[in-house]
Amino acid sequence: MKNIFLFIIIGTYTSLVNASDIYRASPERYVGKSDIVETNVGTKYMAVTSDPQATEAAYNVLSNGGTAADAAIAAQFVLGLTEPQSSGLGGGAFVIYYNAKQNLLTTFDGRETAPLASTPNYFLNNNKNPLGFYEAVLDGRSVGVPGTPAVLGKLHERFGKTDMQKLIEPAVALAMDGFAPSRGLLESLQNDIGRLDKNKKNKEYFYNQKIIKNKNYADVLKAFANKGHNTFYKFPISTNIINAVNKKNGVLTQKDFD
């Protein structure tokens, strides 16, 4: 049995909201539990994610001799595509990596960081009252500097051995060929009608495709594999993020990405 266990949490976060809004709305809907209960036992390795395609990507990496870190990275690249409501390269991540053979626990903190230009009043309106939940979360001010790309890159440098080109292959194939939205994604999209679909590009991408394709995501992953995770924090990727965020009241600059 491989004596390595890896636990990875990837997510995106928002900051200050009204207390009443916290109970009224949440970033992601509960989609229920399945009545099917199965027990599976792994004698050599096991991969578990919330998406079968991500699980398959991780499993195949392990089957070909990859490490738990390699498997987690491959899975996260897929999840960033198929579950954008939950995680992605634009968010933050925490990783806990345990090597049982060495009894060694290693943690990685890849939480997003606030822009240098943010202030204590960042999420207050002109009347000095906290912004409402959706007012804040749909605003550029809710976007920090992504930590996930750096965490995945550093995790691979420390504990990976499979070539990054191999790790991006499942996600790139799905992005180019397309994938059917999961129940969780569809319910999130349904819940956000009237908000998310107000943006033309969001509407075209999420609501006008039964099979979702994302060539831009594939291109970013290829750049990640070819040039390393730091390419995410440089032109043109960083510039595209900054421009998009700052059109919606954000204050990101290249200094935040350096």
Description of each model-found segment:
Residues 1-4:
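Positively charged n-region of N-terminal signal peptides that target proteins for export
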Residues 6-7, 17:
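Cleavable N-terminal signal peptides
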Residues 9-10, 77:
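Extended rod-forming repeat segments used as scaffolds/tethers
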Residues 12-14:
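N-terminal signal peptide c-region/cleavage motif recognized by signal peptidases
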Residues 20-56, 60, 68-227, 232-234, ...:
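Noncatalytic scaffold domains of N-terminal-nucleophile
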